[in-house]
Each structure stands twice: as structure tokens, then as C-alpha cells.
Amino acid sequence: AGYNAWWSCLIPAEVISAIGLPLPMFFQWDDIEFGIRARANGFATATLPNAGVWHADFHWKDRDDWSRYFSVRNSLITAALHSDFDVKSLSIMLGREITQFAVSMQYGLAHTALKGIEDFLSGPSILEDGGRTVLGEIRELRSRHPETVKHPASAIPDVRSSGIADA
């Protein structure tokens, strides 16, 4: 893969001396960017044999949450730093994704992705506090969209019987 997730990562001091610390991209794509940068500077990565951490696959998780902002923004940062960054292809892909969110009435998710793109375009100053400020901004932004509010099952009002099952 060319990188290792943080859970399987041991970083020798010489790597930090040569390439610096990971970028403060809380919390997605930071390990990928660091691994790509390490490999580009001659440091191979390897997963420790039999090491592993189980967590739900990212595709199983709820895509409509605040973390989507960091995924969009940080993937764009990584692409800009370590790829040919085909602006046309990225624009088409992101345009389709945001259109899909809007057509699906996932307005909060569309707004979240757009904020990630806008902040990427604003430049590196967005990384200054490691994400602390923007996390609060994203949560507030998303709270303006009713479909992003999670409700516990206990909040569902009692439903009157239609009488069908009572017969």
C-alpha cells in the first residue's frame, strides 16, 4: 500500500529527523500522507507480522457525519502534495459526489464536503490548530441540517395499532 495505518506504525527517530513530523491533519489521511512522504524519501514501511486492530471498515460506518469533512479536506491535501493532482478529474468526481448527496437530500453531508473543499482551497493555515477549531465549526454547521441529527430509538413516539394485528 505504500503506507501503514497508525495502529501498526513504529517510526524510527531517523525518519522523523529526515522528513519531519506528520502533518497536523486530524484525523483521516494523516497516516497515509506520512507513509507516502516516508517512502518518497527512501523509508519503506512494513506492517508488523500478526499485528492488527479490528474496527469496522470505513465503508460500514455512517458516511454522513462530521468526519467526512476531514476525509475530503485531507485527501485533497495529500493529493496536492503527492500526486499529479488532476484538477479536472477531481472536480468531476467531487461534483458528482456532492450532487449525489444533494439529490439524496443529504444537505448536511453536501455542506460538510463543500466545507472540506473550501478549507483546502484556503491554504495551509487551516492546519494551524490541528483541527480543534474546525471540528466545532463542522458540528455547528451540520446541526443546521435536520437530517444530520441522530435520534435515539427511545425518542420514537408510540404508534397506535392499526387494528390489523388485533383481529
Where are these regions (language model features)?
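Short, well-ordered alpha-helical scaffold segment located
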Residues: 14-15
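Hydrophobic alpha-helix feature that most strongly marks membrane-spanning transmembrane helices
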Residues: 21, 37-43, 58, 80, ...
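Terminal low-complexity segments of carbohydrate-biosynthetic enzymes
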Residues: 73-167
